[in-house]
């Protein structure tokens, strides 16, 4: 299926809009521009598409209302600005959507909400119900309570996690650039826009790790990482300029603009989709070459015999990452043994587990049902 056709057929779309596209150069919200975004989303809804909006802007809005002339540096002041600004942000959205006969819902999330399986399922159920009622959910990070997300977090990652959560067909990330370039366009006049790239392309891995100097500032770096995260659950991602007229409608109709990042694989099963988007790992298992091959080629469970080392502070049931001998990410999964137990089992066949630990638990460190290959 060609790009145009595949994108145009997307029925569940997540749209992420950053602060720079929602504000008047940091001087509060651009109410008129927000009205244009809302009109485009309303048009997608009129076409029968379900839309989830991931929107920044609460801190910028709160800064103006609290009288800050520049972005505060104190975390408590950022939290206060987020709390005040979120009220205005949601109010502006609600008033604009109401003009189009659409109902909205505010949802504030943290990474913890999506890394805990029970809370993840509750959030997914709520969002599915809202979409079933024709509501447009407006999602933001709960900056008032999550200090590290204010300092270092980004809504690109949140957009990818939400795409994972609602099993979206398409994630649209709007930015101040035309898309992803083969070189940093700020430094190289001959930089060429990458119109299409596969999530398995080695160039993306280099970009996502901060290498090659292609992306310049961290803004585009987070978008590449978000696209790779969305790709794990089978969602397509389009990175496009939010300055283009009617960009959301044009992109969703399949118009060739921006950069299309295509997932390597189709949608994964629901549990593995959660595992793929689970961010907070408690440790790492270092695998030998044989174990890496078995996981990638044969889809087996991870056995202790193929593990060279264990790092971190994980307990039974925690998320860990599996890496090869060079440190490359291979898989994520829920481990059956604590780090102390795992260290005792390194390189041992499953038949020795009972004798080593004094009890016989599961024969594998990570069962294949609790493992997702990256």
UniProtKB/Swiss-Prot annotation:
<comment type="function">
    <text>Catalyzes the transfer of a phosphate group to glutamate to form L-glutamate 5-phosphate.</text>
</comment>
<protein>
    <recommendedName>
        <fullName>Glutamate 5-kinase</fullName>
        <ecNumber>2.7.2.11</ecNumber>
    </recommendedName>
</protein>
<feature type="binding site">
    <location>
        <begin position="175"/>
        <end position="176"/>
    </location>
    <ligand>
        <name>ATP</name>
    </ligand>
</feature>
<keyword id="KW-0067">ATP-binding</keyword>
<keyword id="KW-0028">Amino-acid biosynthesis</keyword>
<dbReference type="GO" id="GO:0055129">
    <property type="term" value="P:L-proline biosynthetic process"/>
</dbReference>
<dbReference type="InterPro" id="IPR019797">
    <property type="entry name" value="Glutamate_5-kinase_CS"/>
</dbReference>
<feature type="binding site">
    <location>
        <position position="16"/>
    </location>
    <ligand>
        <name>ATP</name>
    </ligand>
</feature>
<comment type="pathway">
    <text>Amino-acid biosynthesis; L-proline biosynthesis; L-glutamate 5-semialdehyde from L-glutamate: step 1/2.</text>
</comment>
<feature type="binding site">
    <location>
        <position position="143"/>
    </location>
    <ligand>
        <name>substrate</name>
    </ligand>
</feature>
<feature type="domain" description="PUA">
    <location>
        <begin position="282"/>
        <end position="360"/>
    </location>
</feature>
<dbReference type="GO" id="GO:0005829">
    <property type="term" value="C:cytosol"/>
</dbReference>
<dbReference type="GO" id="GO:0005524">
    <property type="term" value="F:ATP binding"/>
</dbReference>
<dbReference type="InterPro" id="IPR041739">
    <property type="entry name" value="G5K_ProB"/>
</dbReference>
<keyword id="KW-0547">Nucleotide-binding</keyword>
<feature type="binding site">
    <location>
        <begin position="217"/>
        <end position="223"/>
    </location>
    <ligand>
        <name>ATP</name>
    </ligand>
</feature>
<comment type="similarity">
    <text>Belongs to the glutamate 5-kinase family.</text>
</comment>
<dbReference type="InterPro" id="IPR005715">
    <property type="entry name" value="Glu_5kinase/COase_Synthase"/>
</dbReference>
<keyword id="KW-0641">Proline biosynthesis</keyword>
<dbReference type="GO" id="GO:0004349">
    <property type="term" value="F:glutamate 5-kinase activity"/>
</dbReference>
<dbReference type="GO" id="GO:0003723">
    <property type="term" value="F:RNA binding"/>
</dbReference>
<dbReference type="InterPro" id="IPR011529">
    <property type="entry name" value="Glu_5kinase"/>
</dbReference>
<dbReference type="Pfam" id="PF00696">
    <property type="entry name" value="AA_kinase"/>
</dbReference>
<keyword id="KW-0808">Transferase</keyword>
<dbReference type="InterPro" id="IPR036974">
    <property type="entry name" value="PUA_sf"/>
</dbReference>
<dbReference type="Pfam" id="PF01472">
    <property type="entry name" value="PUA"/>
</dbReference>
<keyword id="KW-0963">Cytoplasm</keyword>
<feature type="binding site">
    <location>
        <position position="56"/>
    </location>
    <ligand>
        <name>substrate</name>
    </ligand>
</feature>
<feature type="binding site">
    <location>
        <position position="155"/>
    </location>
    <ligand>
        <name>substrate</name>
    </ligand>
</feature>
<dbReference type="InterPro" id="IPR001048">
    <property type="entry name" value="Asp/Glu/Uridylate_kinase"/>
</dbReference>
<dbReference type="InterPro" id="IPR036393">
    <property type="entry name" value="AceGlu_kinase-like_sf"/>
</dbReference>
<dbReference type="InterPro" id="IPR002478">
    <property type="entry name" value="PUA"/>
</dbReference>
<dbReference type="InterPro" id="IPR001057">
    <property type="entry name" value="Glu/AcGlu_kinase"/>
</dbReference>
<keyword id="KW-0418">Kinase</keyword>
<dbReference type="InterPro" id="IPR015947">
    <property type="entry name" value="PUA-like_sf"/>
</dbReference>
């Amino acid at each position: 299926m060609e790009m145009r056709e595949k994108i145009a057929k997307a029925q569940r779309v997540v749209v992420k809009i950053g602060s720079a596209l929602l504000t008047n150069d940091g001087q509060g919200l651009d109410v008129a521009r927000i009205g244009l975004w809302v009109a485009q989303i309303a048009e997608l809804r009129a076409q029968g598409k379900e839309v989830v909006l991931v929107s920044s802007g609460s801190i910028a809005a709160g800064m103006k209302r609290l009288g800050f002339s520049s972005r505060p540096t104190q975390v408590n002041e950022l939290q206060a600005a987020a709390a005040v600004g979120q009220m205005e942000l949601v109010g502006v959205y609600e008033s604009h959507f109401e003009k189009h006969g659409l109902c909205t819902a505010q949802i504030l999330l943290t990474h913890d909400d999506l890394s805990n399986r029970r809370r993840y399922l509750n959030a997914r159920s709520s969002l599915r119900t809202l979409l079933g009622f024709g509501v447009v959910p407006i999602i933001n990070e709960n900056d008032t309570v999550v200090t590290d997300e204010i300092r270092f977090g980004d809504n690109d990652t949140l957009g990818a996690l939400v795409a994972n959560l609602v099993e979206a067909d398409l994630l649209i990330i709007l930015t101040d650039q035309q898309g992803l370039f083969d070189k940093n366009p700020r430094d190289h006049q001959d930089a060429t826009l990458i119109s299409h790239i596969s999530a398995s392309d080695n160039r993306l891995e280099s970009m996502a790790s901060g290498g090659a100097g292609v992306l310049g500032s961290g803004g585009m770096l987070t978008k590449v990482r978000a696209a790779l995260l969305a790709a794990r659950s089978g969602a397509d991602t389009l990175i496009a300029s939010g300055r283009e007229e009617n960009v959301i409608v044009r992109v969703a109709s399949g118009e060739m603009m921006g950069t299309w990042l295509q997932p390597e694989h189709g949608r994964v099963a629901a549990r593995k989709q959660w595992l793929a988007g689970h961010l907070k790992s408690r440790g790492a298992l270092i695998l030998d070459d044989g174990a890496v091959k078995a996981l990638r080629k044969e889809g087996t469970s991870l056995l202790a015999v193929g593990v060279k080392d264990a790092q971190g502070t994980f307990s039974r049931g925690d998320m860990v990452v599996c890496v090869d001998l060079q440190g490359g990410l291979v898989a994520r999964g829920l481990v059956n043994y604590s780090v102390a137990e795992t260290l005792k089992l390194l390189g041992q066949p499953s038949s020795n587990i009972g004798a080593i630990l004094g009890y016989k638990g599961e024969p594998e460190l990570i069962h294949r049902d609790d493992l997702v290959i990256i």
